[in-house]
């Protein structure tokens, strides 16, 4: 694993400014003439703003949520359906937590299923996040699980058996028409095993653990500048 810094000088940056810095830093991975996989959330929104400056140089994007699709279109970037695309060079998205093995918790914005699908197609996953998202052990951030509505209670009982405290995210319906259970109290020592166990529960669409397919590059916004970590 390689780490390098791009310093931003002595200026004290807010959390949003750190997110903006990594969003724009991700442009270095965008190749002209390609279709770019784009994530969801406040940090990904900064990347979309940056991508708008290259709209004449790329073919377009594949989006992980309706919200990102609307933002991309508002900037004049063509949005492809994933079914129209054979492969993606990169997928750029944020994270709610990321550990030292480049495994992540994602899904705070309820777009985890589409995010996971697009990440699986991309050759390279670029994670963009501010330093507050770096953790030693995943699980302090509630783990999102997308669930078929009729299975909500049954899935919740199984999540309790795995050591969690599931909480129904009231009023949230995913772009796929499903619901979210946020699982509190997890100390995820083996993220791959936990991802596989939760995904095996009938009624689960997917869990917001990105352990089997983690990030290849992490751009981390810190007070000292953008830190690049390459797996």
From Swiss-Prot:
One of its GO terms (biological process) is D-ribose metabolic process. Its EC number is 5.3.1.6. The active site is at residue 115. It catalyses: aldehydo-D-ribose 5-phosphate = D-ribulose 5-phosphate. One of its GO terms (cellular component) is cytosol. The keyword Isomerase applies. Catalyzes the reversible conversion of ribose-5-phosphate to ribulose 5-phosphate. This is Ribose-5-phosphate isomerase A. It comes from Escherichia coli O1:K1 / APEC.
